């Protein structure tokens, strides 16, 4: 068989990290995407957890390894290990708590300090089901995403609105960058660039057009 496969289960393994303040719904976004579950009584994550899910993009099996950690300051000591090898991030805020949106820029700086500055970032305004409590307008968040070169969606982990779309879009953009670099390198097939487990994928591609504001909201 032409090309390299990391193993029989997938063509690519991409590490994504969930970041944002505590209580914005990161763990429920993860459980909704990977298990289609939602826990109304979920407590803040202690330490680090990760879950995996495979999906098909352009007839390639993409395995997403998605890491979740608590947003409280006392867990910030794990940042270096948490971010290492990440090729994508979902930066989550709570649309009903403006302070969580205000902290997005700090999270973004920390992310870019610990990863390739061209990492694919999806800004997520979660809890869009609480329409009567919205404190961050869609237009305000769109403006930030446009300025920072982020993708943007509003989601509801409770109602499963846009959750699948947000993860899939982020993974698709990562795949496009990696496969484009493989083609430009003259590889016979995109699978030849699939990394062994644990190997970091360098997604830096200053000539690509992915880093443009992409918008989808509920």
Curated annotation (Swiss-Prot):
It is a lipid-anchor. Gene3D superfamilies: P-loop containing nucleotide triphosphate hydrolases (3.40.50.300). The keyword Transit peptide does not apply. Residues 186-205 are annotated as: Disordered. GO terms for cellular component: plasma membrane. A motif (Effector region) lies at residues 42-50. Its expression is weak in leaves, higher in stems and roots, but highest in petals, stigma and stamens. It is found in: Cell membrane. One of its GO terms (molecular function) is GTPase activity. One of its GO terms (biological process) is protein transport. GTP binds at residues 20-27, 68-72, 126-129. Pfam families: Ras. Belongs to the small GTPase superfamily. Rab family. Protein transport. Probably involved in vesicular traffic. PANTHER family: DRAB11-RELATED. NCBIfam families: small_GTP (TIGR00231). This is Ras-related protein YPT3. It comes from Nicotiana plumbaginifolia (Leadwort-leaved tobacco). The lineage of its organism: Eukaryota, Viridiplantae, Streptophyta, Embryophyta, Tracheophyta. The gene is YPT3.
């Amino acid at each position: 068989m032409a090309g390299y496969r990391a193993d029989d289960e997938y063509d690519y393994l991409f590490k994504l990290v969930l970041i944002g303040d505590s209580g914005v719904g990161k763990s429920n976004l993860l459980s909704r995407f990977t298990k289609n579950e939602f826990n109304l009584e979920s407590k803040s994550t202690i330490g680090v957890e990760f879950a995996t899910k495979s999906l098909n993009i352009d007839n390639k099996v993409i395995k997403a390894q998605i890491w979740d950690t608590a947003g409280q300051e006392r867990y910030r000591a794990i940042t270096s290990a948490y971010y290492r090898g990440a090729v994508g991030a979902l930066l989550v805020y709570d649309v009903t708590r403006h302070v969580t949106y205000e902290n997005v820029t700090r999270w973004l700086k920390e992310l870019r300090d610990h990863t390739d500055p061209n990492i694919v970032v999806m800004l997520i305004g979660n809890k869009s089901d609480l329409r009567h409590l919205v404190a961050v307008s869609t237009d305000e968040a769109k403006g930030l995403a446009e300025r920072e070169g982020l993708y943007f969606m509003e989601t509801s982990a409770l109602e499963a609105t846009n959750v699948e779309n947000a993860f899939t879009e982020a993974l698709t953009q990562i795949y496009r960058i990696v496969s484009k670099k493989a083609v430009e390198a003259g590889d016979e097939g995109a699978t030849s660039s699939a990394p062994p487990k644990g190997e970091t994928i360098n997604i830096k591609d200053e000539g690509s057009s992915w880093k443009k504001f992409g918008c989808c909201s509920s």
